[in-house]
C-alpha cells in the first residue's frame, strides 16, 4: 500500500525535484542568450566583465546578473576549452551561488560547474576561493579553468605548499584563488601570528566553493589544523607507563569498540595506582586526584595504544617510525601524528624512538574556519546521507542534481556468508569469472591488512593478474587508477574516497601518452603514436562496455554509507553501464559490532550450508540501519565537539580581532595607558578595600605591588600615615607617579621607537599568554567529563571555567605589559648572532589525501615583511652586518642598530 507521503511525492515530486524544476526558467533564459553570445567577438565577450562590474556599481545585484553572466561563461568555456556546460551543469552552478551543496555524480563535470558561480561572484571584487583536497587538484583546476577566467579578464591564483608569503599574498589578491583546505586554514593561523598587517597574506573570507565538501566538512571536522612547537623530552615517562599495561589482566579494563573508548575498572585502577606509587609517579592517594590529571591522561593513552590501536590496520611501523593509516582511504600519512600524547604512547608500545610532544601555538577546526565565510557552498558526489549535518552546522542545504545521462549501473543486493573464509572464496571465484569475460573490476577493501590478505589468497589460488592500490604503494597509484578500466583488469583498492581520479573504461589515454611518449619529441611521429594510443583505448573501451562496464566488488561495508556510495560511484560514470555488489560475512567488523549474534542465529535457522550465501533486501535494510546508527553517533560526537570548540573559537576571534586592531592602530599608547590604569585600580582596590578602615589597609603589600608592576619605589606607607588621607587620594598619587614615569620613558625613547616598543611588547605578550591559555583549555577539556559524575553538565562547567581562564588571561596581559614597559631600556647592542625562531610545525590528520604537505619543513610563524626605509617597525630582525634598511649606506650595527629595545 502506498503511503500518503509516497502518493504526494508521486503526484508533485520530492522537495528536491521541485527545487530543481524551479531553476528551469533561468536555464531557458540562459539558453535563449546562447546565439547572441556566439555572435560576439572574443573582445566583445571579454568586455562583458567590465560591463557587469559597472552594473554592480550602479546598484544591480549578483542575482540580477546571473543569467547573462552564466551565458558569458558558457560561451567562454566553449571557445577556450571546447566544453559547453549542459543544462544540468547550469543548475548545479545556480545551486552553488545560492549557498547550497550541489550533489553531482562522478564524471558529471563538477570542476566546470564551479566556473559559473565563481565568475559571477568574482565580479564583486572581494575574491572567491575554490577549495580542493590536494595540491595536484588545485594546480590542475587552476591551470585549466584559469584559462576561462583569463579570457574574461579575471586573474587566477593558486595556493600550494612551499610558496613564499609574497607569492601567497599575490595569489589571494587575485579575483579567483584555488587552494587546498589545509593551506587556507594554515594561512589564516599564520596571519594571526604576525606583527604587521602588511605581512598578512589573506584579504578576507567572502565566498568559498568547497570541492569534495563531505570529505572536508564532515570527515575532517574532528581533526583541527594545528601549528605547534616542541616540548621537553618525556620518553622515560611513556616507556615506564607502557610497561605497566601488559601487567594488567582483561578484568582490569573495559573496551568499547563502538565508542572507541578504553577505561580502567576499579580493580585495574587499584593495580595501576600501586604500580605508579612504586615508580614514584603518583601524587596523593588516588589516581584521580587533581594533581594527577597528566598521569591519568598518559595511562589512558597507553591503554588505548595497546587495546584499541591495531598494527597494520590503524598504523604501520616503517623506518623506526609509527605511520598513521587513514581509516577512510587506507593511505599512509607520513609526518602526520596523533595529538595529545597518543602518538608517543604508540611509539612506546612498538619500542621505536619516541618523538617529543608538541605544544599547540595556534589551532582551528575546518568547521569554524569555513563558517567565517560570508557565503559558503560545496560540491560532491555523495552528500545526501549527511544532509542533516550540513544543515545544522553549516546552514547548507543539499540539492541532488540529475545526471546528464541516466545511470545504467546495477546496484545488486549484498551477499552475506557465515564466515570470512567462505566470503573470500566466493570473492576469488567472482574475480576470476569477471577477468575471464574481460570485465574490468575494482575490488574495494576497508584496510591495507584486508587488501593484502585478499592479494595473498588470490596468489595462492593461482591468480596473479591484479594490481594492489593502497597506502604501501601510493607512488604507483595514479598509473594503477588510470589502467583500472582496461578490459579484464583487476584492481584491489582500499577505500577510494578522495582519490580525485576517474576510472575511464578502456584506460586513460592521456596518462598512457604521458608515460609511453615521455621521451618522444613533438612532431609527426609523436602525433601518429598519440593517435594510435587513442584508437587502441577506444577499442578497449568498446570491449569493456560489451563485458558490462566496470564491476565494483566491495569486500566489506564501511561504517559510513557515504563511503560505500563513493565506492559504488566509481562505476557507471557518464551513462556507462556498470555493476556493484557487496560480499559480506558475519565476522566483518560492522556485523560483529552491531548485532551479528542475532543474524548468525537466523542464518543457522535458515539451514545455510557452508559456502552458501543469503541474498535478501532485508539484509541490506538491516545493515543500513546499523550504518545509520554509527553515522548518528559520529554526528553527535562532531556536534558535541563543535560545542566545546565554539567556546575556544569565540575567544580566538576576540584575540585575533584585538591583534588586528593593535596592528592597524597608528599608536597603541592609549591602550597601554588604559592597561596601566586598570592594573593600578586592581592593586589599590585589592590592598585598600572599599569602606575599610585605615588600620586594615595593606600598604606594605601595595608598595610591593607598585614595585613589581611599575618598577617604582613609592612612599606608600608615608602617604597612608597622613591625617585624613582617603583611598582615592592614594589611587590618584600612585596613578600620577606611574604616569609621570611612563611619560619620562616615552620622552627619553622618542615617539617613533616608543610606538614600536609598545606595539611589540603588547603583541608578543598577548601571543605568549594566548598559547598558555590554549594549553590550559586543553587540560581543562581533558578532565571536565568527570563533572558528569557529580550531576553537573560538563559543557556548562567548561564554558564557565573557560570564561574565568579568559578573564585571568586579560588580567595577566595588563600586568605583564605594564611591568615589561616600565623596565625596558635602550642599550647599546652587544655583538651576538641573531636568535632563530623556535621550530614550528603544521599538523593536520587528513582523512583524504595522506599527502604530507606540512611535515617537510618548519612553518615559521613570522615571515619577513617588506621593509619600508622610513618605518623601522617594518624591518623585523636585521643582521648586524647587513646594510641598514634606512638607506644610509652604513652597516646596521653602526646606524639604527646602535640602539635596541
From Swiss-Prot:
Q: Does the keyword Chloroplast apply?
A: no
GO biological-process terms attached to the record: intracellular protein transmembrane transport; protein import; protein targeting; protein transport by the Sec complex
Signal peptide extent: none
SMART domains of this UniProt entry?
A: SecA_DEAD, SecA_PP_bind
Q: Which Pfam families match?
A: P-loop_SecA (PF21090), SEC-C (PF02810), SecA_DEAD (PF07517), SecA_PP_bind (PF01043), SecA_SW (PF07516)
The protein's matches in PROSITE patterns, at most eight in alphabetical order, are given as: SECA, SECA_MOTOR_DEAD
Q: What is its main location?
A: membrane
Cite the binding residues for Zn(2+): 884, 886, 895-896
Q: What is its EC number?
A: 7.4.2.8
Cofactors, names only: Zn(2+)
Q: Might you report a single GO cellular component term?
A: cell envelope Sec protein transport complex
InterPro entries (UniProt xref): Helicase_ATP-bd, P-loop_NTPase, SEC_C_motif, SecA, SecA_CS, SecA_DEAD, SecA_motor_DEAD, SecA_preprotein_X-link_dom
Q: How does it sit in the membrane?
A: Peripheral membrane protein
Q: Name one GO molecular function term.
A: ATP binding
Residue positions annotated to bind ATP are 89, 107-111, 502
SUPFAM superfamilies noted in UniProt:
Helical scaffold and wing domains of SecA (SSF81886), P-loop containing nucleoside triphosphate hydrolases (SSF52540), Pre-protein crosslinking domain of SecA (SSF81767)
Spell out the reaction equation it catalyses.
ATP + H2O + cellular proteinSide 1 = ADP + phosphate + cellular proteinSide 2
Keywords assigned = ATP-binding, Cell inner membrane, Cell membrane, Cytoplasm, Membrane, Metal-binding, Nucleotide-binding, Protein transport, Translocase, Translocation, Transport, Zinc
| Co-factor binding details | May bind 1 zinc ion per subunit.
List the subcellular locations. Answer: Cell inner membrane; Cytoplasm
| Family assignment from sequence similarity | Belongs to the SecA family.
Protein function? Part of the Sec protein translocase complex. Interacts with the SecYEG preprotein conducting channel. Has a central role in coupling the hydrolysis of ATP to the transfer of proteins into and across the cell membrane, serving both as a receptor for the preprotein-SecB complex and as an ATP-driven molecular motor driving the stepwise translocation of polypeptide chains across the membrane.
Quaternary structure annotation from Swiss-Prot or TrEMBL: Monomer and homodimer. Part of the essential Sec protein translocation apparatus which comprises SecA, SecYEG and auxiliary proteins SecDF-YajC and YidC.
Designated name of the protein: Protein translocase subunit SecA
Biological source species:
Sinorhizobium fredii (strain NBRC 101917 / NGR234)
